[in-house]
């Protein structure tokens, strides 16, 4: 008697289907499970590889940008350098260049000297470079000191020191006469030398009384003769 025929099994009455043995069914189950696991692993590895490709590119780009040996080219910022500072520098350079040209040519120098007058409680300062002759200087001093009047000069605006009588007449007729201190420290009468030489040698001016200036006349005439 076949024992398989008498075995109890689950199923519909009259069914002829046989149930596979647990060993056979287990082998099939294991094979199906391994296939599904391998498929999932393959899918995951493909996804990771795709992500790695994308993620590996980004750090390389960042490291390239952060590389100190190869800084990226920077475009000049609009409005740099500041316009105000740039203009100041340009103007300063222009002024310094103009000043150097003026000093080299000698036309931009100034010759400020102090002017005092006997009896006046104040001092003045004049720029001799602003005037072109003794006549211009005389008019300017007359405006500064109302009581000052300068005597008449020759055609060149100079006192005729060759004629002693004319010098004495000038000093006696004028209440005040201008005098100046030269580079040697001597006080001389204004008008003893040509105007350009006077501008270069004058250190300060003093308007003194004619009676006091008479003592300067012999010294001025002697120095004038030595220069001539």
From Swiss-Prot:
The gene is IAA14. Residues 110-210 form the PB1 domain. Homodimers and heterodimers. Interacts with TPL. Gene3D superfamilies: Phosphatidylinositol 3-kinase Catalytic Subunit, Chain A, domain 1. It holds the Pfam family AUX_IAA. It is found in: Nucleus. GO terms for biological process: auxin-activated signaling pathway; lateral root morphogenesis; negative regulation of DNA-templated transcription; response to auxin. The N-terminal half of the protein contains two conserved domains I and II. Domain I includes a slightly degenerated ERF-associated amphiphilic repression (EAR) motif which seems to be involved in the activity of transcriptional repression. Domain II is required for the correct degradation of the protein through the SCF-mediated ubiquitin-proteasome pathway. Interactions between Aux/IAA proteins and auxin response factors (ARFs) occur through their C-terminal dimerization domains III and IV. Keywords: Auxin signaling pathway, Nucleus, Repressor, Transcription, Transcription regulation. InterPro entries: AUX/IAA_dom (IPR033389), AUX_IAA (IPR003311), PB1-like (IPR053793). A motif (EAR-like (transcriptional repression)) lies at residues 8-12. This is Auxin-responsive protein IAA14. Coiled coil: none annotated. One of its GO terms (molecular function) is DNA-binding transcription factor activity. GO terms for cellular component: nucleus. Aux/IAA proteins are short-lived transcriptional factors that function as repressors of early auxin response genes at low auxin concentrations. Repression is thought to result from the interaction with auxin response factors (ARFs), proteins that bind to the auxin-responsive promoter element (AuxRE). Formation of heterodimers with ARF proteins may alter their ability to modulate early auxin response genes expression. Preferentially expressed in roots and flowers. The keyword Nucleus applies.
């Amino acid at each position: 008697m076949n024992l398989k025929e008498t075995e109890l099994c689950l199923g519909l009455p009259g069914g002829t289907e046989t149930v596979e043995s647990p060993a056979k069914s287990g082998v099939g189950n294991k094979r199906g499970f391994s296939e599904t696991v391998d498929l999932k692993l393959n899918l995951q590895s493909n996804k990771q590889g795709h992500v790695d490709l994308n993620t590996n590119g980004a750090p390389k780009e960042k490291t390239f940008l952060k590389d100190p040996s190869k800084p990226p080219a920077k475009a000049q910022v609009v409005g740099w350098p500041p316009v105000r500072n740039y203009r100041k520098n340009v103007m300063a350079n222009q002024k310094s260049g103009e000043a150097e040209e003026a000093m080299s040519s000698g036309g931009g120098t100034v010759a400020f000297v102090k002017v005092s007058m006997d009896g006046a409680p104040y001092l003045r300062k004049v720029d001799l470079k602003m005037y072109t002759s003794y006549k211009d200087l005389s008019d300017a001093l007359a405006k500064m000191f109302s009581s000052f009047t300068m005597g008449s000069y020759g055609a060149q605006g100079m006192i005729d020191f060759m004629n002693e009588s004319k010098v004495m007449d000038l000093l006696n007729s004028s209440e005040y006469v201008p005098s100046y201190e030269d580079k040697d420290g001597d006080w001389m009468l204004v008008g003893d030398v040509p105007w350009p030489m006077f501008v270069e040698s004058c250190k300060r001016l003093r308007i003194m009384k004619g009676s006091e200036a008479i003592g300067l006349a012999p010294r001025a005439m002697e120095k004038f003769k030595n220069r001539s």
